[in-house]
C-alpha cells in the first residue's frame, strides 16, 4: 500500500478493490441463474415439439443436455446459492441495487419501470431483514434460494432497464416482460418469507424423528 501511495496509484487501487468485490459477489449469482435460465429455455424448446415423435430428431435435445452439463460443470445452483448468500445477508447486493436506482437513465421512458423495481427493492430489503432477524441457521439455509432468486430478478431488471434506456428499440419490450416476471417472483417470495416461522420447518422434513417410547 505504501508503494501504491508513493506512486499516486490510490485511485487505481480503490477501483481494483471495488471491481474485485463486485466480481466476487456477481460470479455465483451469474453462474447459478444463467444455468437455470439455460435449462428452462432448453426445456421449453423441447415442450413445443410435444407429440411429434422421436425427440432425438431435434437439436434442442442436445442443447438441453448441454445446459444440464453446464449447470453441473459450473457448480450446481445450490452451491452458487451457498457462495452468494453471505453477500445477501451482509447487504452487499442491496447496496448495489440502491446505487443502481440512483443512476442516470439515458431515456425517460424507463423511469416508470424503474420505479416499479424500486418497490421490489423495498420488499427485498424487508425479506432480508426478516431472515437476518432469525438466529435459526436452518431457516437461513431453507430461505436462501428464494432470496437468491429475488436478488437475480431485481439486479437483472435494473441492468435490462439501463440497456433499454440506451437502446429502447432493442430492449424496451424485453425490459417490460422481465420486470413483470420479476414482480411476480419477488412479491411471491416476500410473502412466503414473511409468513415463514421456525416451526414450519417440521413440515418439510421427509422423515420424522423417532420418539422414544415412555
Task: Pin down the residues of each PLM region.
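Alpha-helix capping/hinge segments and adjacent helical runs
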Residues: 17, 21-101, 176, 180-214
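Generic anion/oxyanion-binding catalytic loop in active/binding sites
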Residues: 2, 23, 146
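Short glycine/serine- and small hydrophobic-enriched flexible loop segments
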Residues: 4, 43, 83-87, 158-163
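Single conserved hydrophobic/aromatic residue that forms the stacking wall/gate
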Residues: 2-13
Amino acid at each position: 500500500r505504501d508503494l501504491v501511495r508513493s506512486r499516486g496509484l490510490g485511485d487505481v487501487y480503490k477501483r481494483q478493490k471495488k471491481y474485485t468485490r463486485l466480481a466476487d459477489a456477481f460470479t455465483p449469482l451469474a453462474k447459478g441463474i444463467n444455468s437455470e435460465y439455460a435449462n428452462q429455455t432448453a426445456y421449453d424448446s423441447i415442450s413445443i415439439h410435444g407429440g411429434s415423435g422421436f425427440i432425438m430428431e431435434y437439436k434442442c435435445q442436445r442443447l438441453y443436455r448441454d445446459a444440464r452439463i453446464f449447470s453441473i460443470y459450473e457448480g450446481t445452483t445450490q452451491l452458487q446459492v451457498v457462495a452468494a448468500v453471505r453477500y445477501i445477508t451482509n447487504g452487499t447486493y442491496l447496496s448495489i441495487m440502491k446505487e443502481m436506482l440512483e443512476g442516470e437513465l439515458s431515456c425517460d421512458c424507463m423511469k416508470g419501470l424503474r420505479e416499479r423495481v424500486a418497490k421490489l427493492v423495498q420488499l427485498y430489503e424487508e425479506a432480508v431483514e426478516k431472515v437476518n432477524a432469525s438466529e435459526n441457521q436452518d431457516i437461513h439455509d431453507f430461505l436462501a434460494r428464494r432470496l437468491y432468486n429475488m436478488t437475480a430478478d431485481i439486479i437483472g431488471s435494473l441492468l435490462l432497464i439501463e440497456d433499454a434506456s440506451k437502446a429502447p428499440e432493442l430492449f424496451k419490450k424485453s425490459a417490460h416482460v422481465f420486470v413483470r416476471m420479476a414482480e411476480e417472483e419477488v412479491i411471491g417470495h416476500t410473502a412466503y418469507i414473511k409468513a415463514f416461522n421456525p416451526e414450519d420447518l417440521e413440515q418439510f422434513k421427509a422423515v420424522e424423528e423417532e420418539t422414544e417410547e415412555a
